[in-house]
Structure formats: C-alpha cells, structure tokens
C-alpha cells in the first residue's frame, strides 16, 4: 500500500510531502513492522525511489514499510538558512509516523536507514549520530566525505547548508557533519553501531572515498559489508543494489 502524506513541518518550516509504503498485512500477533527510512540524492525528491526503482516490490517481498521524505538539496543538515532537515528526518518525521501508523515502533531493531549519493551520506550520518535509533544502514554510492576540496557542489550551496562563514569544505573536518570523525568518536565511546551495507560502482567518481570509509570501519572493527562492482552513478545500479542491501541486512528474498 502506497500513501502520500502532506503536512506542515515545524523543523523545515514549510509544507512537505512524504511517500510511505506499508505492508499489505499487519502482523496478527501485533508485532511492529520493520521500517526503512529511505533518502534521495541531490537531484531527487520524495518521488525518486518510487519512480526510478522497484522499491515497492522489494518492500513487499521483505514485508517492510518504507518512508521516503523530501530533503531538497539540504545534504540532510540542519541548515544555516534555518530549515532543519536533519532534525526533520531523524526526529520529527519518525515521531509523526509513529503517531499515524500504529505498526511503527521506536525500538531500534525495527528501524533501518538508507539512501543513495547525498542520501547515502544522510543515512550514514543518521546512523552514526543516533546509533541507538537504527539497527542497520544502507549507503549506495554515498558521498561520504564532505570535507573534500574538490566537491562537485558549489561553495554557495555548501554555505547555505553548513554555515554562511564557511570558506572551504575542509573547515567541516572534525565536526558533527564529518562521517569519519563520527565513526571514530562512536568507537572511542564504545557505542554499538548499526550494521552497515555499503556499495559503490567501479566507474563512480565516489569510489575512492567509499574505499577509504570501508578501510576506516574495518580498522575500527565496525560490523559492515562493503561491496564494489561494475556500475556508475545511476539508477540502474542503485535499483540493483538496494536489493543487495536489503537481502544482506534482512535475509535473501
């Protein structure tokens, strides 16, 4: 079942739309359903996963719910211009959905987060910022290092999202936006991190940073699955590997 929600968000201060896939049947014993909070990329919106992939079919096979918000071009940040997209996708939206759908639970084991490209970054950021909220995480072609100088995005977009005084992405190193720093911090504090599935294509310009993040997680002893294979930065491969990620984390279907 596909539902389209439209509501006024306090965090992003405007009307927003969210697509929600619900299992066709509820558990007769009242067991909550597993929910995948699924994020789009820089050039996408809440409709992207529905339009470009078979996510509805894959959700049905795994008997899970999927929630797909619209995060604009925010890089899933609480932005400098006042739209708190990170708080929206990690706090406000889950709370709203749990009030709306009785089968949703805040318990960690019922929640996964995933995304592609910018959304892969957002998903890993959510998993590392709130590891107590998510049992697992999926990143496909994730733009996992936002501190690089050679960003494809212009600096003005960076400033509007991360700080108007920002002169270089390098200034974000070591902050709450830096996934490498977040991973190290969590491990130093002994926190249990979500099991993570990472995929990137061999023809993708983001391959080196994905390899570096995999190497970091390996050195830290973080439970994760890393795969790289033929593919570029396109939906053909994201559609294929969202299936791989779900099968890895939830079991083959």
Segments predicted by a language model, with ranges:
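Non-catalytic cap/lid and distal C-terminal segments of serine-dependent acyl enzymes
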Residues: 1-253
């Amino acid at each position: 079942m596909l539902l389209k929600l439209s509501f006024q968000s306090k965090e992003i201060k405007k009307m927003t739309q969210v697509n929600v896939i619900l299992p066709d049947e509820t558990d007769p014993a009242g067991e909550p359903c597993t929910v995948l909070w699924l994020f789009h990329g820089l050039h996408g919106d809440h409709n992207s996963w529905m339009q470009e992939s078979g996510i509805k079919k894959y959700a049905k096979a795994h008997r899970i719910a999927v929630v797909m918000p619209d995060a604009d071009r925010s890089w899933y940040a609480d932005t400098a211009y006042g739209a708190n997209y990170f708080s929206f996708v990690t706090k406000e939206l889950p709370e709203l959905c749990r009030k709306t759908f009785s089968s949703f639970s805040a318990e960690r084991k019922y929640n996964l987060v995933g995304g592609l490209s910018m959304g892969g970054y957002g998903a890993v950021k959510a998993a590392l910022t709130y590891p107590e909220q998510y049992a697992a995480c999926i990143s496909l072609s994730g733009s996992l290092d936002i501190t690089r100088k050679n960003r494809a995005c212009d600096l003005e977009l960076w400033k509007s999202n991360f700080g108007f005084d920002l002169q270089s992405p390098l200034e974000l190193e070591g902050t709450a936006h830096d996934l490498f720093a977040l991973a190290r911090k969590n491990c130093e504090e002994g926190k249990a991190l979500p099991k993570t599935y990472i995929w990137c294509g061999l023809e993708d310009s983001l391959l080196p940073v994905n390899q570096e993040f995999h190497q970091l997680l390996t050195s830290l002893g973080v439970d994760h699955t890393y795969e790289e294979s033929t593919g570029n930065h396109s939906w053909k491969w994201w559609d294929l590997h969202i299936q791989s990620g779900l099968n890895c984390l939830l079991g083959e279907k």
